[in-house]
Amino acid sequence: MKDKRALKISVYAIMKDEEQFFDRWVASMWDEGNGADEICILDTGSKNGWMDLLYEAADKVNMPRENFVFSQKIYSPWRFDAARNDSMNLVSDVTDICICTDLDEVLVSGWGKELRRVVEETPDAGEVFYYYAWSSDEKTGEAKRYFPYNKCHRHPKFGVEWKYPVHETLVYTDEYKKMFPNTARMSSEKIWLWHYPDQTKSRGNYLGLLELRAQEYPEDKYGLFYLAREYQFRGMYDKTIQWGSYLLAKLKIEKIDDMLMEPALYVLLGESYDKIGANDDCEFCYQESIKLHPTYRDAYVRLAQKLAYMNRPAECFEILKQMEENSVRVYDWRNVDFMWRDWKIHQIKADALMWMGRHNEAAVEMFVAIGDIKTPQDIAEAKQENFYEDAKFLQKALKEIEGTDCCSTNPNE
C-alpha cells in the first residue's frame, strides 16, 4: 500500500472457485488505480492455482501484486458470517474505510473517488450507503431491481461484526456508534455496485442455514421472512404458511420500522395458500396487503391474476384499475421484477377476457404480451407464471370456437 492518498480503502471478499470473475472483479476494484488501496481475499476451498490467476488479473490492469492480501480457510460446517468476519479481519491497520463485495459484483468506474469524497465530507460517518443493482436486463443492461446498500464501514477494530449464518448483516458496537454517529451516501445519480450472478451456482445449503438462523435468533424477523420465502421457493407451502403465520403474529404485536415487511409477508402467504387451493385465505391475504400498503403493486397483480383464474373478470379489471391508480414503484429487495412488466399485465387481461368469451380481444392481449418476452430471464419468469399454458389454452379455445389460430408458442419454451 504505497499510495500517498490520505484515505485508505480496503476491499475484502470471500470466494471459492470463482476464477471466471477474476479479471472483471480485480479491474473493478482497482479502477485504474483510483479504487482500492488493498484487496483482501479469503479463499474457502478453491482448486490449486487461484492465487496465480489473481496475480495475472492484477498484471492486466497494472495493479501491484503487493496490494493483495490472501488467506485460505476451510469451514465445516459452513456459515457466511464466520467467513465474512475472517475476511474482514485481513485488512491492514492503516485502512480507513472498508467495503465488502463478492466476486460476481462490479463497482462502477469512479467509485473510489466518490467514496473518498463522501467520507472526507462526513468524517464521523460509520456507514456509507450506495445503490446496488441486484438484477439487470440481459439485453439493455438497465437495472431491474435495485435498492440502497451498505456494506461499507470503518476499520473493524472500532467495533464491526458480521452476524447470522446466511443473509448476514453488519452490526456495530455502541462504542462504534458513538465514535461514528452519522451515515454518508454516495451520489444517488448512479448505481455504484452491480450484481451479475452465476446462475448455475447452487443454493442447496441455504435452507439449512436459514433454519439454523431461526434456531439461533428466534426473534429475528428478517430471518423468519427469509425462511418462509425459502420454503416457498422449494414448494414447501405448508411450511411457508406455518412460519409466515408465526411471523405475522409477531408483527401484529411487535411493529418494526419497515413499511413493506407485513404487506410483503401477506403476499407470500397468499401465494402459498393459492398453491394448496385455499382460495378464500389466498384472497384475504392479498386484500390485507393492499389495505396495509395501497401503493405496493405485487398484491394487486397477484389478486387480479387470482380473480381472472376464478372467473371473476369484472373484479379482476377493477383491481387492475386500482393498481394503475395507486401503485408506486419503490426500490426494495422484496419487489418482484415482473410485477412491473407489461407481459404480466397483458397475460392477466387475456385470462379475464377469455372467461368473458371475448376471445379475439384476449388474443390481442396475448400477442402484445408475447412481444414483451425477450430474454432468457423473461422466458423463465413467464414459465413460472404459467404464461405459455395460458397462451396454449387460448389457442385451443380459438380453434374450437372460430377455427382460427393465435398465440403460437415454442413447445420447448
What are the residue ranges of the model-derived segments?
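Short, well-formed alpha-helical segments that are part of the catalytic scaffolds
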Residues: 10-33, 38
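A conserved acidic beta->alpha catalytic loop
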Residues: 28, 35, 39-58, 75-77, ...
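Catalytic-site signature of metal-activated, phosphate-bearing donor transferases
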Residues: 81-88, 107-242, 252
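Active-site nucleotide-sugar/metal-binding loop of Leloir-type enzymes
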Residues: 85-97
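Flexible helix-coil transition and linker loops at the boundaries of alpha-helical arrays
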Residues: 213-217, 248-262, 327-338, 375-382
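TPR alpha-solenoid repeat register
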Residues: 223, 257-258, 265, 299, ...
